Amino acid sequence: NKKIKLAFLSSDINNYHSITYFLKTVLLNYDKNKFEISLILNSEEDNYTSKEFKSLCDGSINIKDLNDIDSINKIRQKNYDIIVDLMGVSSSNRLVLFKNRIAPIQATWLGYCNTTGVDQMDYIFADKNLIMDDEVNLYSEKIIFLSGIWNTHSGLEIERVKQDPPFIKNNYLT
């Protein structure tokens, strides 16, 4: 009855990035008796959101300043059962790590809602609204169709600061 070691890899666990509003719901509600959740951060950690998310998890590592080989080795040392990529084919992705099989089960979700094109990426989480029946053959991953909707949103906690527009102080429009 060992816990499943699940890690989320992302460059976007920072203040007010949209994926954090979706991931937070998962981190607040996972079954702590069945899962050990970790973050693999590919970004700065000195912000409110990364600190909060780390406190909701059982562990975290940062690979931002590591090259691919050192990142692969550091991740493999953790013996994760499942790693979920939250970036997909975005500018800060680390898909090359997944090409080197950093976990027995590798999946993508949330950050880029399309195929990664990486043969070693086993699964993508989606719903029938996200991936249509006639698009299934375009995915290199096995598609896990979730019932209902493929994501959840934790709500916004942004406090808006009222201030005059810059042109009032500057006396010109930009």
What are these regions (language model features)?
Residues N1-Y172:
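Alpha-helical solenoid repeat scaffolds of the TPR/TPR-like class and their adjacent stem/linker regions
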